[in-house]
Amino acid sequence: MRPLRMVAPPGPEPLLRVRDVTLQYRSGSATVRATQNVSFDVFEGDRFVLLGPSGCGKSSLLKAVGGFLAPSAGSIELAGRTVTQPGPDRMAVFQEFDQLPPWKTVLENVMFPLLAAGRLPRAEARERALHWIARVGLTRFAGAYPHTLSGGMKQRVAIARALAMQPKVLLMDEPFAALDALTRRTMQEELTKLWEEAPFTLLFVTHSIDEALVVGNGILLLSPHPGRVRAELNSHQFGLASGGSAEFQAAAQRIHDLLFDEAPAAPAPGERATR
């Protein structure tokens, strides 16, 4: 009798699959190569961070995932479909405070994409918007206009507006970079709390090593211009309370070395280095 052979069930498919993506754009009369042969996977419920120095193509990759910049080589797939244009399944939050139409109240800003997409009748859009406004702690300000809000409050509105659309992926391009240090930490805490209450898939861009470690459960390290993958590592063991620990500081130094050394060191366990 032949012995039984146990076959492991297949693992989950990535929600977002980026394969060998090279991005180029025009700047005056020149063609600028932002990234070269970048590949990574993001699974449902991941908090995946793109980390690297200024000019490494992080924001360009986010634009490409959003459908605003077409790859000159490679492919991007979301839920098994090639990304060719923007869509409501990808919502973005930027660092600029003027991303909210100033003539609309907080409630109207959060309702706007729901109504524009034709997804919900006005009454249901209002109910969902109020739910997300409450989730980010701004119920008292539902009738306020953006010019009356602080920078952190405006970012909360932008996050509520994006999550109200229930996107497959939330795209965040250095959303807290323009905030003071205390507000930035508060926003990191609130984003983490929102994810813990109801996990969503996050693709987050930053040039802060500490922020990458506390926000992400996975980090892709990109080399200086043009952006190439230096390494990919897990950071699920860290949180906002980890900042002073020896393990956190060692991880931060390791990332710094991988990003900026001319010849990156061999990867530590749990890392994947790429040349």
Task: Describe the predicted segments one by one.
Residues G66:
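Helix-to-loop junction immediately C-terminal to a conserved catalytic motif
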Residues G74-P86:
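Conserved ABC transporter NBD signature motif
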Residues W103-F112:
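Short coil-to-helix segment of the ABC ATPase nucleotide-binding domain corresponding to the Q-loop/switch region
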Residues R122-F141, K193:
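Conserved ABC ATPase "signature" region
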Residues Y145-L149, M153:
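Conserved ABC ATPase signature
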Residues A164-K168:
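A short, proline-enriched helix->beta-strand linker immediately N-terminal to the Walker B motif
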